[in-house]
Structure formats: structure tokens, C-alpha cells
């Protein structure tokens, strides 16, 4: 099948950010009274928004998840990203090739907040290749695992979702792409930041690399 567009997740696919974000979240949760390990934190939150686990956070910390708390988390997270973020090895070259082959019909469809996505793409030099086709689940009624962000990206490119390829590294993201009707390719280079090939295939990924 020849695809007319490719839709990329951002964190863990284009940029190596998951461990940085997880470290900041772990620090915040520990300071709030939840004695969770970094490994447990990653397992619970990878591929999800923090607010999607509001009930659990409030139960474990005994305090409300306020806008001020989220702002402090974002500040700590962004400080780490500005200092340490790098592109996934080979991602920049791959995106450049896809952009050339598809006449620019590529997009980012992320579950993260758009400010974070824009900052990360800019830092690793990918922003000009994707702009303005950068989409966040935070800006839509539902985020991943619902398909909204992928449907929005496909619509903006003028391509039917069934003619799109999606690249994802989490079960949540693969599920979103599959429900959107796209063909999903899983990325699983190993390590705790990425789902296993078996998990990605079980969620509906056609191939895993």
C-alpha cells in the first residue's frame, strides 16, 4: 500500500524526552507525598497525560491536582528538556526523507501539550519540516487513546485516515492510530521508555521496528 501522508507521534518517536519528563514528574509526585519509584511512574504515565490520572494522583498524595501544581511540573519538565533533550537517533534524516517523498504531507500528532511539542521540535531542528501541521490532543475534546488528534492531522493534510501511516511507540498511541483507521507502525528500540514489540502488535501495529 502506498501512503499519501505520514503522521508521527512526538515523544519517544522524534525526540528522546520520556525519561526527562518522567524524572520531573517523579520529583513532583514524591514531593507531594506519593512514594513512587521512577520505574513505577514511567509505567503508569507513559503515553498518557498527567491529568488523565488525576483521581489516582489525588488519592495517593491526599491533595488536589491544582493548576498551580501542573504549572510547577511544566516548569520543572521544561527546564530539563531545554537542558538535555535530543532527537531520537535517525529521526531527523527519516523525517527529511518522508517530507521530500510525500511533498510535505507529514504531521505531528501528539498527546502532549502543544507548547511542549513546539519547543521540542524547534530544539532538535524539526519544526520547519512540520509547521504548521502540528497537533496536540490537549486542543481537542479527547486525547489518545481516542483517535481525535490523528483525525485532525489527516483532515488538515487533506488525506483520508486510511491513506495515512502512523508511527507510534506506546500502546495508547497505537490504539489511537488504529481507531482512526490508519496503518500504524510501532517503534520499539528497547528500554523502559518504550512499549515492547509484542505489546505494540497486540494493540494493532502492523509492523514494529
Predicted regions and their residues:
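Asp-based, Mg2+/Mn2+-dependent phosphohydrolase catalytic module
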Residues: 1-4, 96-97, 102-103, 113-209
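Conserved G/P- and acidic residue-centered "switch" motifs that form tight phosphate/ATP-binding loops
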Residues: 9, 13, 110, 169
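Conserved SAM-binding loop
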Residues: 14, 87, 106, 166-167
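N-terminal start-of-chain detector that recognizes signal peptides
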Residues: 27, 77-80, 106-109, 137-139, ...
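Residue-level marker of regulatory loop/turn positions in helix-turn-helix DNA-binding domains and
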Residues: 87, 109, 142
Amino acid at each position: 500500500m502506498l501512503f499519501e501522508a505520514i503522521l508521527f507521534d512526538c515523544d519517544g518517536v522524534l525526540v528522546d524526552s520520556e525519561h526527562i519528563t518522567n524524572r520531573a514528574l517523579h520529583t513532583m509526585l514524591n514531593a507531594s507525598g506519593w512514594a513512587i519509584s521512577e520505574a513505577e511512574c514511567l509505567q503508569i504515565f507513559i503515553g498518557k497525560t498527567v491529568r488523565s490520572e488525576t483521581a489516582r494522583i489525588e488519592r495517593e498524595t491526599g491533595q488536589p491536582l491544582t493548576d498551580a501544581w501542573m504549572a510547577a511540573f511544566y516548569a520543572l519538565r521544561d527546564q530539563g528538556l531545554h537542558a538535555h533533550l535530543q532527537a531520537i537517533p535517525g529521526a531527523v534524516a527519516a523525517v527529511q526523507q518522508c517530507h521530500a517523498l510525500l511533498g510535505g504531507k507529514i504531521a505531528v500528532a501528539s498527546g502532549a501539550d502543544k507548547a511542549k511539542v513546539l519547543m521540542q521540535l524547534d530544539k532538535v531542528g524539526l519544526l520547519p519540516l512540520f509547521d504548521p501541521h502540528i497537533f496536540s490532543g490537549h486542543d481537542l475534546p479527547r486525547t489518545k487513546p481516542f483517535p481525535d488528534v490523528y483525525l485532525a492531522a489527516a483532515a488538515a493534510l487533506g488525506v483520508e485516515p486510511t491513506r495515512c501511516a502512523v508511527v507510534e511507540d506506546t500502546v495508547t498511541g497505537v490504539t489511537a492510530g488504529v481507531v482512526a483507521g490508519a496503518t500504524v507502525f510501532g517503534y520499539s528500540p528497547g528500554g523502559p521508555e518504550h512499549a515492547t514489540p509484542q505489546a505494540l502488535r497486540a494493540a494493532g501495529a502492523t509492523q514494529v521496528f
